[in-house]
Amino acid sequence: MSNNIYPLTTEAAFTVASHLTFEDKRECTEGHGIDPFLLAIGALSGDDSYFFKAPDGKSAAIGGVENDGKIWMLCTDSVKEFPRTFARDCKRMIDSRPEKLLWNVVDKRNTTHIKLLRFLGFKFLREVLYGPKLLTFIEFCKINVR
């Protein structure tokens, strides 16, 4: 995988949930109708949950893959300080996954995540109204052919 990606810890989950980017916090609360801390707590029980430690030692992002290939991520502004390192580490992690299909939805307003997803090789399928506020989200997926 990467020297900067580690199994998720309680400390990393709470650090990231406490310092989310504006876009990620908005996507959690407005788009999914859930408190980011609840997502972080839930992620601790998953076997495939990770955190990205930036070169300056800060916990900069958490993410993971659920059993059905549903991929997710929450970031702090620290990832913007090391964008190339973060993107390359994410690519290594995604490319190492055994699932044939990785998928989820992303808030159309979250342009940072959309740009990263495009770099990682995900395809955007269609716009859908999603969540309690029926906001525009974009379905995306990546088919791993090996």
Model-predicted segments: where are they?
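Conserved acyl-CoA
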Residues: R88-L102, L120
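Short amphipathic alpha-helix that is part of the acyltransferase structural core
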Residues: M1-I34
